[in-house]
Amino acid sequence: MAATILQTRDLCIGYAPKRRPRVEVAADIGVELLKGELVCLLGPNGAGKSTLMRTLAGLQKPLTGEVHLEGRDLHGLTESERARLLGLVLTERVDVGNLSAYALVALGRYPYTGWDGRLSAADEEVVRWAIDAVGARELAARSVGELSDGERQKVMIARALAQEPAVLLLDEPTAFLDLPRRVEIVQLLRRLAGDRDRAVLLSTHDLDLALRCADRLWLLPPDGPLQTGAPEDLVLSGAFQRTFADVEFDPAIGSFQLAQEPEGEVSLVGEGLHALWTARALERAGFRVAEDAPTCVEIIRDNDDTVWRLHTATGDRVCATLYELVKCLKTDATA
């Protein structure tokens, strides 16, 4: 079994402002992070994800309880010791002036350099490795200010990797990225976690991607204890649905649905990829696919050509596209 790198015991997180009552965000948190794992921290807005990430990173103290990093109390470590064990990538955009991407990544070596900050040949080798690990070699000479959000995020991850940490913590690393870049970053993190000497924990609002990619989920509901398990276990137990009760999740297909008034039922005749995407188009438009429904859609394929024949009580129509098919069904439904 993989070794535990990070562990919490009876952890209570929140804020303790001076001269005011403390604010408890979440309590009774007892979790562990194992080598080789990619873990996603999920929860609604306000549940305390960022507070938990900052507490695990040592940026704020817990109200009560303990955080252990490789068996040692996190707050008993020096700043240099902590930086050698834990790499952190935050959501906030950091102003780094005119630094090149290479120079920014090189800052990750500060726990290992002397008072003058000079890099040794070994340090330079680690910096190049970190840049290559995230696929950013072509970005190394460019100014950080010229990079896109996705490119910049790669460089920030490389900077954390240059610390050679046992744990990589990332707070909303895909928050400002488009879908292809989000997938790219999560695939990168999954590959980095595959290194048995490293664990990766990221908080995210991208629920679909977390369900597909995470080895485990940490679910932080707004009114209950943190729960942990494989994505499939948490769906089967109902914990995932309870945590996100304000959105409609279909456990049969493992994805979120738009809540809408049903337009009617349609039977579907066809197979393969065209049938799959036809069913998706129908469901998106509010029509439930049912085997015995009187309204029927038949997929007719002739070599590379495809049409959809719509059979209704008022007659048959042939539609050249799914857009046309949905428009016809909606017209009939409102007639």
Model feature map: region roles:
Residues 42-44:
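The feature captures the beta-strand-to-loop junction immediately N-terminal to the Walker
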Residues 121-139:
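Conserved ABC ATPase "signature" region
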Residues 143-147, 151:
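Conserved ABC ATPase signature
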Residues 164:
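Conserved catalytic motifs of ABC-family nucleotide-binding domains
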